[in-house]
Amino acid sequence: LGGRILLTADCTLMSDYRHSEFLGFGTCAPPNFIPDFLYKWLFFPPINNQKGLPTSAPYGLRKIEAQLLKEGFSVKTVSPDNLRKYIVQAQALGIHVMDPFGLGPASSTLAFILKKEPFLAQYFRALLDSPEIRDAKKRGLKIIVGGPGVWQFQYRPKFAEKYGIDCIISGEAERVVGKIFQAAVRGQQLPQYYEISVEDAPKLEEIPDIVCPSVNGLVEIGRGCCRGCSFCSVTLRPLRWYPADKILHEIDVNIAGGNAGTILHAEDVMLYGSNNTIPDDKKLLKLHQAVVKKCEGVTWSHCSLAGVAAKPKLFAQVAEIIRQKQSWWGAEIGIETGSPELAKKIMPAKANPFKAEEWPQVVKTGMGLMHDNWLIPAGTLIVGAPEETEEDVIKTIELMDDLKDVRSLIVPLFFVPMGRLKGEEWFKETQMTNLHQELLAKCLEHGIRWADELIDL
């Protein structure tokens, strides 16, 4: 297939965040007392390049790159700072987005607090507004946007037309991306918004392995989630776990590219290989033994408190394997609420295999085990969920008191309508109550308490 295709992302995504994914959350903040150039250098410096091509790139972009190469396209992934060098001959440009308008929970919360637009929204717009892209559009370049953040375009309906975006792809694109880019390089009309249904999601054997390194060695170990929380969009996707050899092959690609460590990515790493909410001891241990043998360091993207609490002995065994080469590791976790009543309403299966009304105890047990085994969680709370009552907020404040001795960061995030709750109202700053302010203060106090120890690790 002919046609030159470029893939890129804005500079807040084309960074390795100084080899700390947690620093990537700095892109969610708006401009502040730190000068912009210094803030960028501190939190999202540009990735290393070889001849204008990044030595690593966001994992989702690498998957699309692999699929297009598999289908015979001429494709290059380029850094935004080096687009000018390659875009002259390009017929189509694919752009990966995570939080293009700063409407995600973390960025919208920080935007409210600091009253400014987040960096990630500013740099996405600046990318599309760059002279090289504007010039390429005039000669017929097609722009295709995809990634986890495309849902935000529904709140900015005129943006795509204003900035010359020809097609927005929503969902897992492996099955369709080839035909859309083929139409683009042929100069054909593209669908303005292409939504991929659950039925059209790729099967395991249809998902290609990455062929070039991903940022910070991140590799997917599975897709989808079986818990069905109403506020989450991932749970709308079918659950699939990659076989270990597929995961290890992608780790080899990253190691060959200079990434000695890896981030195992799934919505719940503890459930690797399981088709329900009970961890599979054999598969989880076998995977970690193989990964630690290859890598200098391992961390997780996400895991569930219920999965940890369900199998304390298994979790301790996994921790022992991981800590052979490192003193600690991290993961993002969803605490969401301290209220059993709210848990029953918006996330009845999040506590499985325990009952929803046991949720506060599940949180305390899971986080206690993490503390004992040196997993340092970055926990999130939902502020302003639909049907939230004052009593629910009080219960969450009480839970924060119970967690004060757990080594962790806990971040309150304003409710954003996603998943099955996408028709609900956004939580607005005018809805902030004294109780909400008390909860935010508790989280800040908790973070300050643990900051010194976490920085020293």
Write out the residue ranges for each language-model feature.
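N-terminal pre-triad scaffold of radical SAM enzymes
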Residues: 2-12, 200-235, 248, 252-255, ...
